[in-house]
Amino acid sequence: MSFTITHRTGDMEVGPSIDGLLALVDELDRDDPEHPDVAVSHESGWTLSAYPEGLIAWENVEQDGEPRHMRHVARERLIELFTEVALGHLETVEREAWAAGYP
């Protein structure tokens, strides 16, 4: 399974180490209103994006479908979810308590 990370600057890395996910989450600590999020994308198009305030969004950017979101997600939980996406465990992420649409 292949995955891509999107840094806060917009730069992308294909197939990075899973160990780099902690550093990706740490990027949320920088103040950058122009680039507010980081993301992990599975090769199938499923993408989990995270914002500094604990907001995350889950959507398939390759297919039509309703995006979903959660608020107040702790950093530790975010790292777990990013890891699940990177490993291709999409059904685990799907089972989360998502709210419909974008916030």
PLM feature segments, named:
Residues 42, 51-54, 100-103:
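Polar/charged, Gly/Pro-rich intrinsically disordered segments
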Residues 1-7, 45-73, 80:
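Intrinsically disordered, low-complexity regulatory segments enriched in Ser/Thr/Pro
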Residues 68-103:
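Mixed-charge, Lys/Arg-enriched low-complexity segments
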Residues 1-41, 103:
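Negatively charged, low-complexity tracts enriched in Asp/Glu with abundant Ser/Thr
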